[in-house]
Structure formats: structure tokens, C-alpha cells
């Protein structure tokens, strides 16, 4: 019986064994049914939204809540005698005074970097990618299938993303300039696109992977790109923004400088920990690769490019599964299940030191795998085609797809 269970699991991919989603996405199914309540459904799912329209939405609800919107371009900053930022001077001569500032100025880091001098800790020794090419590829016909997942494909010096939206696909190639010229990168992207993309010109992006260890200085906190950046991973950036805002809301005590300085130290320690753990999680995608065909993948697997803490965890995970004690919950953006998916989805082998006897949950796991297989069959019959589901919501909202994807 035990041998049969092992053979059954070996015949399945990790994703197929532990999730219902694997079979559903390959069948082109959407994550919910038209009659399900908004923002919920039988499958976990995320959104690709129009960033410009979402920004307009946030602007409108903020103004309705009493926020004053001032539109302008920052020219310089004015410092107070104690070193705090006293005001922003705009290019049109206006002065915007404030008691506390959030630096959302992106890569330029106008306040936290250029004014207050917080340096950027580079992660280039661990995470090699520093450039990207991106473009939008329209569908051939309006009713073309919409892939219900993001497709990431390993390339010689990086990876391509391929995101299916209502009217188009968003496609790009993120790569390491140390391992690939810009010309070779564009050639790789064009091979991926095929003839459909021959007339399209990709947009080139350059970035430095890293983060600021002091994201809160005085009366200023960096948020978003001014705090740090890891590849084109918008969802990770949004999670970090939310985590920072929640901490600021809890930590900030008005009119108490000593409490504010203590809060800044706590905030910087916690956010630095989060960024460090994200470095480990991202590096995990690369360092356990079995590819050895290009210098990019060989360098990624070189122990010299793997943070020591991650090396220590991998050494243990080769003899036991990840434990909740490997993770400091308050510092984690990615929790243990995320590590399971990367490790075992990429074929990482854990040879249990004492076999299954040491792990009393092994039998329950096999029973759970059987329940997953049964649920897969039911879900395939219950969930609609992804394009049909999107068309349903566009019709319900009275909005044409072209209005909601750019």
C-alpha cells in the first residue's frame, strides 16, 4: 500500500498533487462562477488591474475622505534646524509644509535618498537581473482564449513573463546585462513572440536591485520604489507598501520625538528583515535550478552567489521539509507554503533522514492528495472558460474590454 502511494505521487507533478488549480488553468478555466459573490470564489485568484484607473480611484476616495490634493513637481526641500524636512518647494514657487512625509517619488528617492542621504544596499551579487524589455501584443481576434495564469519561461540570461489580459498580452523579458547584451536580449524576446511581434518595439527598462536599510529617517518614510526594488514584481511591491503603511499607522506617535525615533529604529529593523527574506525567496527560484547550459544559470547556482542564511536552510531542507520554525512570521512576505511550491515545484529533493516514520502526517498527506484529485474532476465541470467569465463581467458592468486593459 505504501509503495502504491509513493508511485501515485511520483506520477504527478507537485502542483497537480497538492492543488486543484494545476488542471484547471491548463484547461483554460476561470477561478469562479458567474453567480459567485464579488471578490470570492472556489479558487484562489489575483487581479491584473489598470494601474492608472486604480490610481484615479484611490484619488477620488481620498479626496472624499478629506485629503487635500496638491498637484505639482518638487524642486527642492526645506530642512528644519533639527534636520527634519520642513517643506517641499515646488517648481512653480509654492511651499508645501508638513510634519511628516512619505517618500513615494520612485527610483529618484527625492526625500529619503537625495535629501536625507539614505544609501541603497545593492543585491546585485545575489540577484543578477538589472534590465527588462516590455511590450503589449494584441490578440489576433476578439474572442481569443485568455490564459488564466501568468506564464514565466526561463531563458538563457533571465526569464520572460506573459500575462493574458482581455484585449492583449503583456509580455517582457527580464535579464542580466552581465550575461547578455541588449541586442541579444531583444533577439530572445522576438524569438519568443514569433511573427506576431515583428512590428512591435519593446520598451527598455533599467533598474538596480536593492533596498534601503534606513527607510525611516526623522519625519520621512520611504514607500514603494524609493524604499527598494526587486525585478518587475509589482505584487511583491504592493505587499511591502501595505506592510509599511500598517506599521507606520501603529508606530507613529504624534508630537513625541523620542517615541518617533524609537519607532524608526523598530521600523527599519523589521523592514530590512522583510527585504532580506524576499532576497532569499527570490534567489531560491534561481539557485536550485538544474540548468547548466549558460553562464547565467551556472552563476546562479554558484554557492558564492547564495546568501549564507539561504545556504543553511537548503542544507537542512535536503534532509527534512521546511518547518514553521525556519520563518519569523513578522518578517515574512512569503510564508512556508510559498517555499514549498518553489522547492518541490522545481524538483528539489528532500531525503527524509528517518523516513516517513518521523513524520506522522505522511498518511494524512496521501489522503489529502486523494481528495485533491477528486476535487479536480468536480471543478473542471463546474468552472467556466476564462474568456467567457471575463465577458460576463464586462457585460454586467457595461464596460467594453478595451476600456479596462492597457
Regions found by a protein language model. Give the residues of each.
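Single conserved hydrophobic/aromatic residue that forms the stacking wall/gate
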Residues: 1-9
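Alpha-helix-centered segments that form part of catalytic cores
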Residues: 10-49
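Extended, composition-driven regions rather than compact fold-specific motifs
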Residues: 20, 46, 156-157, 168-169, ...
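Predominantly flavin-linked oxidoreductase catalytic cores and closely associated redox partners
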Residues: 37-188, 245
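A short, glycine/Asx- and small/polar-enriched loop/turn
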Residues: 80-86, 214-218, 290-291
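Conserved FAD/dinucleotide-binding core of flavoprotein oxidoreductases
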Residues: 154-206, 226-239, 251-257
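FAD-binding beta-loop-beta segment adjacent to the flavin cofactor pocket
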Residues: 204-222, 228
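Long, low-complexity C-terminal extensions of enzymes
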Residues: 250-406
